[in-house]
Regions:
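Nucleotide-activated chemistry modules centered on ATP-dependent adenylation/adenylyltransferase
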Residues: 1-150
């Protein structure tokens, strides 16, 4: 278990299990922390929606055979694309997910955005067609603006 201590608080009061992958980070709170809000300092991939920029960001995600291959017309490897979407969406407060039952909190900006974009393609078409999906990110929320099949 990794220990994360908030400024001025004893480490024993701030124990969380932290798991990090390319897709994001998850924090599991112990029983004595269940229901407590996590300190803002614990988040490294996402900005609080109240501190996110006032201007929305727009991502145009291009897919080939159902796989994301470019952002705003710039071709990228899958790893580069995930990292780019994580940075952009996270800066706009998108990607915090909380499971109140288990006490797990996740930061997964790219997963949230790419899931929404993939869903917009439609289940039957996503593996067969090339497409572009436009997503708007704004103060902790996201929405698919348009989806076009090639």
């Amino acid at each position: 278990m990794r220990v994360i201590a908030a400024a001025g608080a004893p480490a024993a009061d701030n124990e969380y299990s932290v798991h990090t992958t390319l897709w994001g980070r998850s924090f599991e709170r112990g029983p004595r922390h269940a229901g407590d809000a996590l300190p803002e300092e614990i988040y490294s991939l996402t900005t609080s929606s109240t501190r996110a920029p006032d201007a929305a960001a727009h991502l145009e995600i291009s897919f080939e055979s159902g796989l994301p291959v470019a952002i705003n017309g710039v071709p990228m490897t899958l790893t580069e694309l995930i990292e780019s979407v994580t940075t952009i969406a996270g800066n706009h407060g998108v990607g915090r997910v909380t499971d109140d039952v288990s006490g797990t909190v996740c930061e997964a900006p790219a997963a949230v955005v790419l899931h929404a974009a993939h869903a917009a393609l439609g289940v039957e078409a996503m593996h067969a067609l090339d497409a572009t999906v436009r997503v708007e990110l704004f103060r902790g929320s996201h929405r698919v603006v348009s989806a076009h099949h090639s």
